């Protein structure tokens, strides 16, 4: 009995961290990204950032320090990517209980990553 209980607890602890992560959503059109986003950009430090994405995938982002970048989201072989005035890389969109999260990861690790939540 103790063995079964220990096994059950081990399985629950192993699976429970996965429940907190939302699965990536397959983006079929960059129009799905249109709107205002707020989050964090990380290069050497982490700072607040805002981004506005147009229906054609073009975007403008700025940080609280005043750094700005413009870019374009696009689909390549069914995968969401971006190219900006600073870097290029992959992007992913997830939806967890109605909260849309957009993650951007530069191909070159020197340029860091960003994570935004849709605000409108």
Per-range role (PLM):
Residues 22-26, 41-50, 79-120:
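Beta-sheet ligand-binding and adhesion/scaffold domains
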Residues 1-2, 67, 101, 116:
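Intrinsically disordered, low-complexity sequence elements enriched in Ser/Thr/Gly/Pro
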Residues 35, 61, 100-104:
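Conserved glycine-centered beta-strand/turn positions repeated across beta-sheet architectures
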Residues 43-81:
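N-terminal glycine/threonine-rich, aromatic-flanked beta-hairpin/loop signature
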Residues 13, 72-73, 99-102:
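Generic low-polarity alpha-helical segments
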Residues 1-32, 36, 40-42, 119-120:
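Amphipathic/hydrophobic helical signal segments and adjacent flexible N-terminal regions
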């Amino acid at each position: 009995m103790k063995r079964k209980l220990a096994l059950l607890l081990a399985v629950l602890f192993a699976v429970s961290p996965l429940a907190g992560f939302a699965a990536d959503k397959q983006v079929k059109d960059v129009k799905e990204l249109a709107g205002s986003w707020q989050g964090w950009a990380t290069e050497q430090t982490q700072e607040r950032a805002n981004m506005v994405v147009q229906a054609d995938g073009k975007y403008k982002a700025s940080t609280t320090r005043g750094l700005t970048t413009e870019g374009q989201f696009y689909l390549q072989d069914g995968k969401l990517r971006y190219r900006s005035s600073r870097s290029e890389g992959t992007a992913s969109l997830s939806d967890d209980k109605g909260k849309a999260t957009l993650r951007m990861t530069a191909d070159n690790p020197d340029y860091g990553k960003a994570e935004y939540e849709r605000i409108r």
